[in-house]
Amino acid sequence: MNRAVAPASIAPPAANYSHAIASAGAELLLHTSGVVPTAPDGSVPDGLVAQVETVWTNLIAILEEAGMVVADVVSITTYVVAGEDLGVVMAGRDRVMAGHRPASTLVVVPALARPQWRVEISLVAAR
């Protein structure tokens, strides 16, 4: 059975999609959409460090809403607008993962869907 995961503690999706779908069966699988740096009030913080922190806050809220924790994350895909920002993005990921090492893909892109977004992250978690 699949169910949409939509924590009330984060901003709603920016378009017609779910933040995440939790799939239950022999195991629990969670596939998130690309999560962007939008705060619950709809604002986007200035600065890459704050944007990375907001994305991870949103991702952790999604994990918790699905009954999962960071240790359940099996794959991360990160999109970043500027190659020189990779160190900041990786440091944010490493801080949140706290030694947990899921598969990870980091892609430098020319732009994201909204010009103020500098980072977008999706993940897969399984338990």
Feature roles, as predicted:
Residues 1-127:
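Short, polar/acidic, helix-capping and beta-turn segments at strand->helix junctions
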